[in-house]
Design a protein with these regions (language model features):
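Bacterial N-terminal signal peptides
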Residues: 1-11
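Sec/Tat signal peptide C-region and signal peptidase I cleavage site
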Residues: 12-16
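N-terminal structural module
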Residues: 17-69
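Short polybasic amphipathic segments
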Residues: 26-28, 139-142
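Mid-length scaffold segments of soluble, non-membrane domains
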Residues: 60-137
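Short strand-turn-strand beta-turns centered on an Asx-Gly dipeptide
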Residues: 144-147
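Flexible glycine-rich active-site/ligand-binding loops centered on an Asp-His dyad
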Residues: 149-175
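Cysteine/selenocysteine-centered motifs that mediate thiol-based redox chemistry or coordinate metal-sulfur cofactors
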Residues: 174-184
């Protein structure tokens, strides 16, 4: 009887996933939709593999197919929690490199959106968060250090933006695998 009573107790708070000492919730909400944590990854940079941020990808439904995630005109969110300070110029360079490697023939069409994204960037410190949320019909909201700094319209823009992490030439393959939930 006690075992049955234990099973009927209400569940505790939503659990969280952890990577490199950073906790991210298993779910979040955007535009009235619940988004589930698809996976976590660690961005490592330079030849010395310096930890830069922990990223979490949130989707309406889990998926391990990067092309389908990028192409889907559905609400999605990428959360970057920085584990070290990064200068604005390094953030802009990373976005520019990702654009060059993943935009292909869409580069000219999405260049104005990336110019707005780069203009919205600022230096980040350890503990700061960058959140990129795409909502169909509304665009991609860029939230940096708890402030909405830009909303960039266009399904093409979000597709190229999310390709930086999920496309054929991602920032790190291990980061992409983590975001797809296949590395854990």
């Amino acid at each position: 009887l006690l075992a049955l009573a234990w099973l009927l107790l209400p569940a505790g708070p939503a659990s969280a996933a952890q990577l490199a000492g950073v906790d991210l919730p298993d779910a979040t909400e955007a535009d009235g939709k619940v988004l589930v944590l698809n996976g976590l990854g660690l961005r490592e940079a330079t030849l010395m593999m310096v930890d830069v941020y922990v990223a979490g990808l949130y989707l309406e439904a889990k998926s391990t197919d990067p092309a389908a995630i990028v192409a889907a005109d559905r609400t999605k969110r990428l959360v970057l929690k920085f584990v070290r300070s990064v200068g604005r110029e390094n953030l802009v360079k990373a976005f520019s490199d990702g654009l060059d490697k993943n935009a292909g023939e869409r580069a000219a069409a999405v260049a104005p959106g990336f110019a707005r994204l780069n203009a919205a960037m600022d230096d980040v410190k350890k503990g700061d968060t960058l959140i990129l949320t795409y909502v169909p019909g509304a665009g991609t909201t860029v939230r940096l250090k708890d402030v909405d700094v830009a909303t960039i319209e266009g399904e093409d823009f979000q597709s190229v933006l999310f390709s930086i992490w999920l496309g054929p030439a991602p920032l790190n393959r291990s980061l992409r695998d983590g975001l797809l939930g296949v590395d854990r």
